[in-house]
Amino acid sequence: MAQVQYYGTGRRKSSVARVRLVPGEGRIVVNNREISEHIPSAALIEDIKQPLTLTETAGTYDVLVNVHGGGLSGQAGAIRHGIARALLEADPEYRTTLKRAGLLTRDARMKERKKYGLKGARRAPQFSKR
């Protein structure tokens, strides 16, 4: 018999995470490595686990993730978004809990582009009065 799986795609900055939830004991595997190997920061790992702790499903699913693009923070945000969407597919009753915590909303903040005539997005060259 085929195993039950729930899918969710999460995005943040320039990172994209494809998340699969499989019934298990709570392991999180990112790009075929344990989460602590891929993301060294404990704060980011807590951030990733937030949807599971809010819905009290922390020990019921194994989370298998493929993530690419961006840096560690962007990837963590993408994984969190993907887990929230996959949990929603698993049980639609989680919608209110996840929505209230803001986990279903795609964070649209992106890096602002550098403008010509400026040193950065907003940083102007030094001004000299004389």
Curated annotation (Swiss-Prot):
One of its GO terms (molecular function) is RNA binding. One of its GO terms (biological process) is translation. It comes from Bacillus subtilis (strain 168). The gene is rpsI. Keywords: Ribonucleoprotein, Ribosomal protein. Part of the 30S ribosomal subunit. One of its GO terms (cellular component) is cytosolic small ribosomal subunit. The keyword Ribonucleoprotein applies. It comes from the Bacteria. Belongs to the universal ribosomal protein uS9 family. Pfam families: Ribosomal_S9. The keyword Ligase does not apply. InterPro entries: Ribosomal_Su5_D2-typ_SF, Ribosomal_uS9, Ribosomal_uS9_bac/plastid, Ribosomal_uS9_CS, Ribsml_uS5_D2-typ_fold_subgr. This is Small ribosomal subunit protein uS9.
